[in-house]
């Protein structure tokens, strides 16, 4: 957390659609947190709350349904984790909080954050995700898990098998809500929700909250507190955005090869829109003797875990992926993102480039475009009130 840019965070402005008169807590001490939780917060590297934390944590602790929206890297995960850990009764072994995420990697990452923050609290937490052995889940859940972080499909399965008791769940957290509410997950979330006690507190968290998502949250929340960052600030100010005009699609590959030496200075993620393209690009790069790893949703879970682990530890430097990786995955060293394909929707653009400057860190995003992409790029600029400049001839000038 020591690279967090406090000045940038202080400049965040909140939307006029936010709930008025939300009290701002400038220190963690002023929140009257459990001493063991406070110890975990400082141990994790936080010194003072970020803008979103200073507003949302106490609302969650006070039991209010909460909708929190801020860009990637502002401490959203810690916001709901701290609120949740404060509310947990450590003497009761039943599941008391359920977190749903759109990807397995994100569910595991959240579990790790909860573990670290709750380090001194003797909290039992489990990641309940697809692609792992069902028997292992059942065994873990039988041991008693106060907090479960999972993906909707596996959680529904465990609830229906009566292996995950929902009787004492007092908090439901929907992370990356805009992704969760897309068609694939919507029905599963409704399915989980109907098993929960009527008094359950709902916390909705996301970097982007479209109008459709806000309408959807009305079905789950009662008089929610809304803490919303102004949209034109959602693009992290610390991220420099560029485009490279390629005459045709085939030339993108040559451009990427030219850039490769600069990719490995730190670590880079290259995004493609399809699994086929990820596999193709990975093969092409390797044929040219470039070292890359790749990841997409069709891979087995243990393979995805191993790739993520290598990337986290810095053993691999360049990752080629679909949007499965774009959602909230935190690898501190990533300072360059390349969109080999522009994302198909505006919301995913922020999720992708949000990787490259987490928590106030500086970063660079490079978009490889053909003339067919120019209109889409202009749309992104307009939507986020930002400027995506042409990349200078010498990439070293921007790295």
Swiss-Prot record:
Where does it reside? Nucleus, Nucleolus
Q: Which CDD domains match?
A: SF2_C_DEAD
PROSITE patterns from the entry? DEAD_ATP_HELICASE, HELICASE_ATP_BIND_1, HELICASE_CTER, Q_MOTIF
The principal location of this protein is nucleus
Could you identify this protein by its name? ATP-dependent RNA helicase FAL1
Q: Motif span (DEAD box)? A: 175-178
Could you name the domain of life of the organism this protein comes from?
Answer: Eukaryota
Q: Where is the Helicase ATP-binding domain?
A: 57-227
Gene Ontology MF terms in the entry:
ATP binding; ATP hydrolysis activity; RNA binding; RNA helicase activity
EC main class here is hydrolase
The function of this protein is: ATP-dependent RNA helicase involved in 40S ribosomal subunit biogenesis. Required for the processing and cleavage of 35S pre-rRNA at sites A0, A1, and A2, leading to mature 18S rRNA.
Q: What is its EC number?
A: 3.6.4.13
- Name the positions where ATP binds: 70-77
State the reactions this protein catalyses: ATP + H2O = ADP + phosphate + H(+)
The listed location of motif Q motif is 26-54
Pfam families from the UniProt entry: DEAD, Helicase_C
The GO biological-process annotations, alphabetized, read as: maturation of SSU-rRNA from tricistronic rRNA transcript (SSU-rRNA, 5.8S rRNA, LSU-rRNA)
Domain free text: The Q motif is unique to and characteristic of the DEAD box family of RNA helicases and controls ATP binding and hydrolysis.
Q: Which residues form the Helicase C-terminal domain?
A: 238-399
| GO CC annotations on file | FAL1-SGD1 complex; nucleolus; preribosome, small subunit precursor; small-subunit processome
Instruction: List the keywords (alphabetical).
Output: ATP-binding, Helicase, Hydrolase, Nucleotide-binding, Nucleus, Ribosome biogenesis, RNA-binding, rRNA processing
Of which family is this protein a member?
Answer: Belongs to the DEAD box helicase family. DDX48/FAL1 subfamily.
